[in-house]
Amino acid sequence: MSYILVTGGAGYIGSHTVVELVNNGYNVVVVDNLVNSSYDVIVRIEVLTRKQIPFFKIDLNDHDALDQVFKLYPIQAVLHFAALKAVGESTKFPLNYYSNNVGGAISLLKVMEENNVKNIVFSSSATVYGDATRFENMIPIPEHCPTGPTNPYGETKITIENIIRDVYANDKSWKCAILRYFNPIGAHPSGLIGEDPLGIPNNLLPFLAQVAIGRREKLSVFGSDYNSKDGTPIRDYIHVIDLAKGHIAALNYLFNHKDNGLCREWNLGTGNGSTVFEVFNAFCEAVGKKLPFEVVGRRDGDVLNLTANPKRANTELKWKAQLSINDACKDLWNWTTKNPFGFQINNYSWTKFDSESLTNYDRLNTVRTFNGKFEVSISNHGATIVAAKLNGIKLNLGFDNLKGYLREDNPFFGATIGRVANRISKGDLLINGTHYQVGLNELHRTSLHGGTYGYNKRTFLGPIVKTNEKEKETTMEFVLIDLDGTEGYPGDVETKVIYTVRDTGVGGELGIEYEAKLLEESGRDSTAVSLTNHSYWNIGNQPSIEGTHIKLVSNKHLESNPLDSTPTGKIVTSTDLDSQNSAKLGPDGPVFDYCFVTKQQDKLDTRNDELRVVATATHPKTRIAFTTLTTEPAFQFYTGDGVDVAGVFTKRSGFCLEASRYIYNPKWFIPLNKGEVYGSYTIYRFENF
Amino acid sequence: MSYILVTGGAGYIGSHTVVELVNNGYNVVVVDNLVNSSYDVIVRIEVLTRKQIPFFKIDLNDHDALDQVFKLYPIQAVLHFAALKAVGESTKFPLNYYSNNVGGAISLLKVMEENNVKNIVFSSSATVYGDATRFENMIPIPEHCPTGPTNPYGETKITIENIIRDVYANDKSWKCAILRYFNPIGAHPSGLIGEDPLGIPNNLLPFLAQVAIGRREKLSVFGSDYNSKDGTPIRDYIHVIDLAKGHIAALNYLFNHKDNGLCREWNLGTGNGSTVFEVFNAFCEAVGKKLPFEVVGRRDGDVLNLTANPKRANTELKWKAQLSINDACKDLWNWTTKNPFGFQINNYSWTKFDSESLTNYDRLNTVRTFNGKFEVSISNHGATIVAAKLNGIKLNLGFDNLKGYLREDNPFFGATIGRVANRISKGDLLINGTHYQVGLNELHRTSLHGGTYGYNKRTFLGPIVKTNEKEKETTMEFVLIDLDGTEGYPGDVETKVIYTVRDTGVGGELGIEYEAKLLEESGRDSTAVSLTNHSYWNIGNQPSIEGTHIKLVSNKHLESNPLDSTPTGKIVTSTDLDSQNSAKLGPDGPVFDYCFVTKQQDKLDTRNDELRVVATATHPKTRIAFTTLTTEPAFQFYTGDGVDVAGVFTKRSGFCLEASRYIYNPKWFIPLNKGEVYGSYTIYRFENF
C-alpha cells in the first residue's frame, strides 16, 4: 500500500484533486498549514469519498515534521499544491510569498530527496508567462512561450519550476510534472467543497458569488475598453473538476513513464477564451437573475488575452477539459447557496478526542446554540453524545476522553446504537425468510446493541456542519459505512446520524435524525436496521437521579422474557407508574428497564410521522424540564440500575430514554430492502421552568 | 552606536570586507554558519583590526536566532555575503544551494523587515549573466545585459536579486545595492586572511597556490583553443581588497542617498580581461618558479570572455579597482606560504571559556604536541595558562571556567602579568624623570602586578595559531592593546604573548615570548613594561608541593623591604638553599618568595640573549622533571605560602617560577621608549626522567 502526498490538500484545487485521487483508487495523505483553508474541507472530503484521509497540519518549512510524515507513510508521489496565491497580496507581502511558496517547496523537495521520493506534480500557473501578448503569435499560449512573470506570486512559481528543473538536471531519475493552470472556476457538484476565499475575493467568480448571495454589493469590471468582442479581457476558465482530473492524468503519465525520469511542463486550460461579460452572464443565468455590476478602470498588470494552448496535455496526457462555463457556474451557485459563508461556522469548534492518535479521525465536535444557553459535544467515536449542557449544567453521563469510552464497563454512554438496537435472542435474526447469526456478546446468549463491534465502537466520518440562521439551528451530519458481514449483518449499509442543535428561546434542544440505506453496490437485497441513542440523562446536577419526576405518554411496554430480557411478543401494562403515567425516581426504585410502546410499528421511515412528546422529566432542584419527542413507535426507559463504572458512576446515576423501534421480534420486524430508506427523528429538549 | 551586520563574514570576501569596514570606522557584527569557513578567520580579523568582533554562529534559515541578533545590536545595514558558491557542486546538490542561498536570503530579508532594517548590500555574481557572448556587443558586460544563469548557483543569485527587487517594488523605503562580482583573487597583504577552499579548489588561483605549495601535482588548463590571444578564456580578475572596498563605496552610497530608497545593480570588476595563461604566468613570477600545468579539454559551461564593464560603479559609487593581478599573486603567495593549509590546524581546538557570554571573546584555546604527550590550554582572559598536562597529569593550578579566575582570592593563577610585574612601592613609577602614580591595589601601599585591572584581567585578542611541522611546534599568538592611562600607565602599548607548544620527543615544552612596543599613535615618548607569567606549578600529582626537589642557577636575590616587600636595592644571598643551590620542599618550608637574579639587567629586549636553565624541579613520585629556561635576568621563586582559595587550594599547592626583570626600582629600571621593543623568552619544559 502506497500513498500520494498532497500538500495544500485542504485548498481549493487541492481538495478537488484529493477527491479525484480517492475516486481513482489512490491512497492519499494530506499536509496543509491551514493558513488559508479549513480542516472542515478534509472532513467533507472524507464524507464525500467515504474514506478516512490522514491529515497533518504542517508548514512545509518545518523540515522535521514533514520528514515524519514520509517516515509514517510510504509515499509514492507528491502533488504539491500548497502555496499562497493572491497576486495582489504578493505585491504587498513579497517575502511572505517567497518564504511560504519558494521556501516551502525547497523544504519539500529536500525531504523528498532524503526519503528517495522522486515523483512530483507541481502546481504552477499561467502567471509564469506574464503578458504573453508581448510576443507575436503566442495566443493561445504554448508551453514554449518565454516566461516572465509580472508579480511576486508569479515569480515564486517560476522560481520553483526552475528549482525542480535543476533538481532533475542533476538526477535524471526524478519524474516531475509541472502543470500550469489557467483560471480554475466552479465547485464540486455535491456542493460539499468549493472555493472559500478569506476576505475580499480576488477572482471574478468568487466575487460574483458573494454578490449573488448578498455578501457584496456589486461586481467591479476592471476595464471594458480592451480589444475583445465586448471590451472585457479574455481568460481561459477551466472547471476545477477538469483541472483535478488533469492531475490524475499527469500522475498516471509519470507512473507509466517507466524507463527513465522526466521533467516537463503542461498547460491545463480549455483552449477557449471567455470574456468577463460572458462569464458574468453565464453566472447570472445560473443564479436566475441579473446581478449588479459597474465598469471601473483597468487594473495594473491585467492584459487582454490569456488563453491556453492545451494541445500538449491533450495529446501527451490524454486529458481534455470536458465541462463548460455553464457547468462551473451551476456548481458554484449550488456550493454558494449550500454554504453561503463557505466553511466558516462560528458556533462550531472541535478538539482532538483521541489524544494518542496522530490523526484527527476522532474529534470532539461542539456546537452551541445561538442564545449560548445550550451546548452539545459529539465524538466521531460512536457519533456519541459526550456532553450536553444547559446554562453550564451537565445533563448527561460521559467521559472526558476516548479512553473512558473504551472501558469494558462503559454502559454505552451517549452512543449511537446499531446496526440493531437492544437484544436479539440467540443472535438469530430472520430477514425475509433467511436466518442470520449476528454477534453474541452477552454470555453467548443474546446479541446486545449490535454486538461486540457495534456502532458505538465505530469511528464515524464527518460531521458536515451547517448552520441555518433563520431556524436558529446548526446541524452536524455524521456518516458510517457499515460493511456487509460485520457482526454477521448482511449488506453494506450507509448510516447517517444528523444532530441538530437548536435554540428554543428559553433553552435548547438536540434533534437526532437517523437515515440508513442499503448501498447500491451491496450484494444483498435486504437487511435489518434499528437505531437509537443510548444517552444517560441526569437533570438534577447531583450524582443520583433521585428526585426526578418522570411522566410517560404510555404505560404499555413489551413483556420481557426473564431468561434473556428479549420480548415475549406480548404487550403489558406497567405497574410502576401512577394513574398519570408518572413516577418519582427514588434512590433505589422504582426500577424501569422496559420498551414502552406508543403506537403500532408500521413504517421503515417514521420521519414524516407526528413528532410527539413521549416523556417529560423535571427536577425541582435545578428546575430543568427535559422533554423527549419522537416520530418513533417505542422507547426504552431505563433507570440505569445496572450502571457500575468503577470509581466514576454507580447505579441510578442517569436514566435513558431511547426512542426506537420495538425490540427485535420477528412478528414486529420491518426489514430494510434495497431502494428503501430507514429513518427516524427524535428531539431531546432542555429548558428551565 | 550602530552596527553593520555582515552575513558570511568568516568567508573569503566577507572577511576582507569586515576588515575594510572596521578600517572605515564601522562597527560590525558577523553571523556565519561556518559550514565552509572557520571561526579562526574572525580571530584573525580581530588581531588585524585590533577590535573585538561580535560573532554569532547562526544559519540564516534559523529565523529566531537571527532575530535575536537584531534585538541585541542596533543594525543599520546588512552586507549579505553568506552563500554556498561552488558552481560545480551546485549542479550536484541543487537543493542545498536553494535551501542555503535562497532560503537563507528570504529568512534574512524577513527578519530585516520585521526589525525595520531596510539597507542591504547583496553579494550577487557575474554568473547571473550566464554566457554574455550569446548577445552582440555585450562584452565588456554592462549591468543591462539580460541575465540567464546556466547553473543552480547562478540561479540562486538571480532569484535572490529578484526577491530583493520585489521587496523594493513593494516598499520604496528600502535601499538595496546588488553587487555583481567578477573573479575575486588575492589575499590580505598581512597574510593573516585569505581564501581557504575546502577540498579541491574550483578556481584557478587557489588551485595554482596549492600546486605551488606542493599540495597538488599540476594545474589543469581547461581548453587552449578559445579565440583569445593565447587560446585560453578571458576573465576579469579583481583583487579581493578592491572588491571589499567596493562594498564600502556601495554602503556609503546607500547612506548618502537620503531622500528615498533605491534598488540598483553594480558590476564590481576591473574592466580588464586576462587569460588563464596570463594569470598563470603572473603567479609563477610571484612564486619565483615555473609551475607544472597540462592543457585538457574544455569544461562544460565555460565561455570565452567574461569581462565587466565597471563604469556604473566607477562613476556612481566613485570606486575603481586599484590593484593589479601581480599584486594579487604576490598577496596570495604570501598568504599561502604563511598558511599552507589555510586555517586548518589539526592539533588546535577551542571551547567557550565564558559560558555566560553571548560572544566568543573569551575562549579556552588548547594545543597538543605532535607526540600527544603534552597539552596546554590558554584562555583569552589574561592570556592565562589554564591547564598544562603531561601524559594526562595536570601540572599547574587553575580553574575550569572564567568564574574561578574572577574570584577575589585568585592569586593570579597562570595569568600574564603586566603592564609592570611585581610591586611598585607607593605606586610611584619614575620614567625618564617623570613620576607616574599607578594603581594601588595592596592596602593603598603598593601597586602589585599592574594594579586592580592588570593584564590578568584583560581579554586578549587572538590567538593566531600556526603550526610548524618541521620544528614540531604550534604557536598561539595573543595581542593586547593596553591604552594610555589605564591603571595610570602612560602610552598605548601593544603587547604580544606568543605561546609555543613544542614536542621535545620525551615530553613537551611551553615557550612564552613577550613583545611590547609603544604604538606610533600613542601620545607618549616612553613608558614602563615588565611582563611575566604567574603560573603555579605542581609536578607531584598531589595537593601539596611537598617532596619537590628544586635547584636554582643562582642563590642571589633582591633584598625585600619588610614593610611592603619592594626591593631595597641590595642583592643578598639566600639562606634557604644548600651548597648546590638546591632545596627539598616540605609541607611548611622552606618558604621562598624572592626575586633571584642571574645576571645584570642591561637590555630592554633579552630575546637574543642566551636561553639558560635557571631552575629545575623534580618529583620522585611522578618522575617529572620541570626545567625553566629564560633569556631574562631574574626570576621570582615563590612557594605559594599565601595561597588560600577557599574550598579549592591552600598554601603550598603550587610554586611559581616567574622569569622576569628585576622588581621595579629606579636604579635598575630600563624604560620602553618610542621605536624600541621590549622582549623576552622563557621556556617551561616537562619531561619524565
From Swiss-Prot, chains A, B:
Keywords of this entry: Carbohydrate metabolism, Galactose metabolism, Isomerase, Multifunctional enzyme, NAD
Stimuli inducing this protein: By xylose.
BP terms from Gene Ontology: galactose metabolic process
Pfam families for this protein: Aldose_epim, GDP_Man_Dehyd
Cofactor(s) listed: NAD(+)
Active site feature: 534
Molecular function per GO: aldose 1-epimerase activity; carbohydrate binding; UDP-glucose 4-epimerase activity
Residues engaged in binding NAD(+): 3-34
InterPro entries given in the database record: Ald1_epimerase_CS, Aldose_1/G6P_1-epimerase, Gal_mutarotase_sf_dom, Galactose_mutarotase-like, GH-type_carb-bd, NAD(P)-bd_dom, NAD(P)-bd_dom_sf, UDP_G4E
Pathway participation: Carbohydrate metabolism; galactose metabolism; Carbohydrate metabolism; hexose metabolism
Family: In the N-terminal section; belongs to the NAD(P)-dependent epimerase/dehydratase family. In the C-terminal section; belongs to the aldose epimerase family.
Functional summary from the UniProt entry: Mutarotase converts alpha-aldose to the beta-anomer. It is active on D-glucose, L-arabinose, D-xylose, D-galactose, maltose and lactose.
Identification of the protein by name: Bifunctional protein GAL10
Gene symbol of the encoding locus: GAL10
